[in-house]
From Swiss-Prot:
GO molecular function: fructose 6-phosphate aldolase activity; fructose-1-phosphatase activity; metal ion binding; phosphatase activity; protein carboxyl O-methyltransferase activity; protein-glutamate O-methyltransferase activity; S-adenosylmethionine-dependent methyltransferase activity
Record flagged with keyword Acetylation: yes
Species name: Bos taurus
Alphabetic keyword roster: Acetylation, DNA damage, Hydrolase, Manganese, Metal-binding, Methyltransferase, Nickel, Phosphoprotein, S-adenosyl-L-methionine, Transferase
Functional note: Metal-dependent phosphatase that shows phosphatase activity against several substrates, including fructose-1-phosphate and fructose-6-phosphate. Its preference for fructose-1-phosphate, a strong glycating agent that causes DNA damage rather than a canonical yeast metabolite, suggests a damage-control function in hexose phosphate metabolism. Has also been shown to have O-methyltransferase activity that methylates glutamate residues of target proteins to form gamma-glutamyl methyl ester residues. Possibly methylates PCNA, suggesting it is involved in the DNA damage response.
Lineage of source species: Eukaryota, Metazoa, Chordata, Craniata, Vertebrata
Domain remark in the UniProt entry: Subfamily III proteins have a conserved RTxK motif about 40-50 residues from the C-terminus; the threonine may be replaced by serine or cysteine.
Cofactor(s) demanded: Mn(2+); Ni(2+)
Superkingdom per UniProt: Eukaryota
SUPFAM superfamilies: AF1104-like
InterPro entries the record matches: ARMT-1-like_metal-bd_sf, ARMT1, ARMT1-like_metal-bd
Gene: ARMT1
Protein name: Damage-control phosphatase ARMT1
EC number: 3.1.3.-, 2.1.1.-
Sites bearing Phosphoserine, chain numbering: S102
Amino acid sequence: MAGPPASLSARDVGSFAYLSVKDRSPQILTKAIDTLHRHKSEFFEKHGEKGLEAEKKAISLLSKLRNELQTDKPIVPLVEKFVDTDIWNQYLEYQQSLLNESDGKPRWFLSPWLFVECYMYRRIHEAIIQSPPIDDFDIFKEFKDQNFFESQESIIALCTHLQELRKTIEDLDENQLKNEFFKVLQISLWGNKCDLSLSGGEHISQKTNIMNSLEDLKPFILVNDMDRLWSLLSNCKKTREKESVTRVDIVLDNSGFELITDLVLADFLLSSKLATKIHFYGKTIPWFVSDTTLHDFNWIIKQLKHSNNKWVSQCGVDWEDHVKTGRWVYLDHIFWTLPHEFSAMSQVAPDLHAALQKAHLIFFKGDLNYRKLTGDRRWEFTVPFHEALSGFHPAPLCSIRTLKAEVQVGLQPGQGEQLTASEPNWLTAGKYGVFQFDGPL
């Protein structure tokens, strides 16, 4: 039996992976360096001369990293001892064992794109932790915060809709509840457009009311398994014993506006009784510019709570209460910031895999999670999603993703080719989305 197809890689000149490594990654490193420059006086105020020395050191390390990338130098092992350093360096050795290049060393433009892109963000983190006393500085925080502040109009509309819905949710019949469920799912999907790593850190925010666009956006959903999600969760609700739990896990993607759309979905799941407990999974370190960390999660809820809009503030109060009472649980794990595809989870992070197996449903948000679900490979468009998961089935799962990388499976025959003919960049523009489910039929 043939093995899985080759990984996406920058060795394919002109591909999205190639353009990302050639242009977007150096641009992100430049923005990271600029951010450190801009915070120079803050570092001095907090730490004196040591803060300035640390800023210079971090900039020097990031400049070196940018040079290594742009000149296609060999990928080097991590040096700073951190909880995941050994796993990273073992993975680098594994990548080296796959190569038969002249010097047998993984390089930026030759190795799998998923690996080198994750490695870049891990090296950015290494540059910061090697530079105390600024070693707890989140180099991407201001980009995430700006996305939140620029999306206020949409946030107000969303929170208002949610609070109005909660007043009447007990009175909705099954069909009405299903329609509202589909709405919050679509809000969470299109919230995924706000990805700062795709824009090279340029500002992306949701300035218009997404609620008004849902009907217009429906034709851009290429795979729509929302009915299967409804069947699964409504069945859980109907068969649930009085004291038993229905747990939905959400593997988060971006902070800012997208995180709020995910929290709206999570709130709806509780208030509709489709779920009784939500586990959120975020990143342990700043990642892919806009990914959610524990600090981001808590910061967003606090910002909402202190809003001068009563509905937004009410959401903040309610969500803080969900966290305090344990209905919402935020968790992180180093596996989410490793370069491994998810099919390796049971070997690399058996504790995380075992935790996910206890969920009734897992939502995987966003593009990076989709790439890791499918191994970021050159799959044919019609390959079933179940097959592309390569044995990763901890529980029923669903990818909620707008397309921003050249990997997509589970399409109808001819669907991908038709899109390629009419819109050459359909895979990477963030215009199309999927709800792709894998679980019992």
